């Protein structure tokens, strides 16, 4: 099956309605995808990209219905990933020796995937041109790390079509190919989802590459992507949208996501969200349970947000595994100009909140005061959680707020906290921690682990964790773990 694009250019790709996972399980496809391949028939015949390897036979069979494969003069591979070059090996069995134009990095990747170093590779550089007859040329533009080192774009003069590779694309499958034919809300949602989950780490490169392409002053009548719709109606709209997304994008939105063992952290999330709306009814607050909702939806919401709040119960003195995985994804996506805070419930020890706070700080977020609640939050603790949400709303507001609320109650409680994490005990007000002074008694005070009865002796210390002899308990690091049961400092009590 072919779809006419413009003049002597046709789409010869493959739709995939059933695919649900991309990059392993990194990206969940909710609308399928398409593998877009294009056939240009001027004096020279050019094939731009192939399809995923699972459709190799069908792709070649369809192509043979349109042309004699031997008439293909050149193959252009904009990207070596298997969903672009997957059918290349099967095609080259039919037409060995056909010149392949791609970047130097693509040669390395294609050979690594297909193991055919003897293929007729022709490496290109930005600005190189290939004459295809009838007064038309293909002009190549390298686009490294958008989103692989081998990536490039190809521009067809005369028809003013930019074959943009993954840029400006979407994992979106529809019987209709052009952007003006499909549901606009679905289309832009999928564009945003694609950018947020795949291209966000390369935003600075996106801006630089778009400006470079625009500096060539070439007309762009169509943008033919590698996945999803071809942009023929106002094609530069997606270029301008990319420039906006790449520029530290944020909306007036706060994303809260959490995982909870016994529903306690979920209760905190609900109360915090209510507190935010008490103060700033205009802000969009989105709440997600990472165990039940799609992670790519969550990451897309994070991309759109001015700030995020991450909650977890404490398990084995660390955060819940799915929260740890989400924070690893967030660190890799390298979000910029966003605020963050941690919260969570615990029983013996509240190590999860401390770790989340640290991970968010390391990931480049401007971190706010965190919040811990011991056991199941009661009415007073829920009130404090709600006030914490009010404080967050005030601190993160993008414009002056007109809503009145208990300013003294919120500000005083948060400002009195010197540590990065606030401890909320049921039926207890927040109080400023007492200043720790090392006394002679403290220097000799042994501490008992209330769980396993291991004893910390200051005279001995704990060399395996870098705690030197003669270190008083007050100077032992907060991330110290009992060597026997691996719980934190919170479970230790003084030996009377």
Curated annotation (Swiss-Prot):
InterPro entries: Anaer_NO_rdtase_flvorubredoxin (IPR023957), Flavodoxin/NO_synth (IPR008254), Flavoprotein-like_sf (IPR029039), Metallo-B-lactamas (IPR001279), ODP_dom (IPR045761), RibonucZ/Hydroxyglut_hydro (IPR036866), Rubredoxin-like_dom (IPR024934), Rubredoxin_dom (IPR024935)
Cofactor(s) the protein needs: Fe cation; FMN
Pathways involved: Nitrogen metabolism; nitric oxide reduction
Entry's Gene Ontology cellular component terms: cytoplasm
Binding-site list for Fe cation 3: 449, 452, 482, 485
Any one Gene Ontology molecular-function term assigned to this protein's record: nitric oxide reductase activity
Chief subcellular location: cytoplasm
Intracellular or extracellular location(s): Cytoplasm
Annotated Fe cation 2 binding sites: 83, 166, 227
Cofactor note text: Binds 3 Fe cations per monomer. Binds 1 FMN per monomer.
Flavoprotein keyword on record: yes
Family: In the N-terminal section; belongs to the zinc metallo-hydrolase group 3 family.
Function of the molecule: Anaerobic nitric oxide reductase; uses NADH to detoxify nitric oxide (NO), protecting several 4Fe-4S NO-sensitive enzymes. Has at least 2 reductase partners, only one of which (NorW, flavorubredoxin reductase) has been identified. NO probably binds to the di-iron center; electrons enter from the NorW at rubredoxin and are transferred sequentially to the FMN center and the di-iron center. Also able to function as an aerobic oxygen reductase.
Cross-referenced NCBIfam families: PRK05452.1
The protein's name in its UniProt record: Anaerobic nitric oxide reductase flavorubredoxin
Gene encoding the protein: norV
């Amino acid at each position: 099956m072919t779809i006419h694009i413009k003049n002597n250019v046709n789409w010869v790709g493959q739709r995939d309605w059933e695919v649900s996972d991309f990059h392993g399980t990194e990206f969940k496809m909710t609308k399928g995808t398409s593998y877009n391949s294009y056939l240009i028939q001027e004096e020279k015949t050019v094939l731009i990209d192939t399809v995923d390897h699972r459709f190799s036979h069908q792709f070649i069979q369809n192509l043979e219905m349109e042309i004699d494969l031997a008439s293909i003069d050149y193959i252009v591979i904009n990207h070596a990933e298997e969903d672009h070059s997957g059918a290349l090996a099967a095609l080259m069995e039919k037409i060995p020796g056909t010149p392949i134009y791609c970047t130097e990095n693509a040669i390395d990747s294609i050979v690594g995937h297909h193991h055919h170093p003897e293929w007729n590779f022709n490496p290109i550089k930005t600005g190189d041109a290939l004459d295809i007859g009838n007064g038309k040329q293909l002009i190549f533009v390298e686009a490294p790390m958008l989103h692989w080192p081998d990536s490039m774009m190809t521009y067809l003069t005369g028809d003013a079509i930019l074959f943009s590779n993954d840029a400006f694309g979407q994992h979106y499958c529809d019987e209709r190919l052009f952007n003006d034919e499909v549901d606009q809300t679905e289309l832009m949602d999928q564009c945003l989802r694609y950018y947020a989950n795949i291209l966000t780490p390369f935003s600075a490169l996106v801006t630089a590459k778009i400006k470079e392409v625009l500096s060539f002053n070439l007309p762009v009548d169509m943008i033919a992507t590698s996945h999803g719709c071809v942009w023929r109606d106002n094609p530069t709209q997606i270029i301008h949208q990319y420039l906006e997304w790449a520029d530290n994008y944020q909306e007036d939105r706060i994303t809260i996501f959490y995982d909870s063992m016994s529903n306690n952290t979920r209760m905190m999330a609900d109360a915090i969200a209510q507190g935010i709306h008490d103060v700033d009814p205009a802000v969009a607050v989105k709440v997600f349970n990472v165990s039940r909702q799609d992670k790519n939806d969550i990451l897309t919401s994070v991309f759109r947000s001015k700030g995020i709040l991450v909650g977890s119960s404490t398990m084995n003195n660390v955060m819940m595994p799915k929260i740890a995985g989400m924070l690893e994804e967030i660190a890799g996506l390298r979000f910029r100009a966003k605020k963050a805070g941690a919260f969570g419930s615990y029983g013996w020890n509240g190590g999860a909140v401390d770790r989340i706070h640290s991970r968010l700080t390391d990931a480049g977020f401007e971190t706010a005061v965190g919040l811990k609640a011991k056991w199941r939050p009661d009415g007073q603790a829920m009130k404090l959680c709600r006030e914490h949400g009010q404080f967050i709303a005030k601190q993160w507001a993008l414009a002056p707020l007109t809503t009145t609320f208990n300013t003294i109650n919120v500000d005083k409680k948060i400002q009195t906290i010197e540590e990065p994490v606030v401890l909320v005990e049921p039926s207890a007000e927040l109080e400023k921690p007492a200043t720790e002074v090392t006394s002679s008694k403290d220097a000799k005070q042994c501490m008992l682990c209330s769980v396993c009865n291991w004893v910390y002796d200051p005279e001995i210390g704990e060399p395996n964790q870098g705690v030197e002899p003669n270190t008083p308990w007050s100077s032992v690091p907060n991330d110290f773990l009992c060597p026997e049961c691996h719980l934190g400092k919170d479970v230790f009590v003084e030996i009377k």
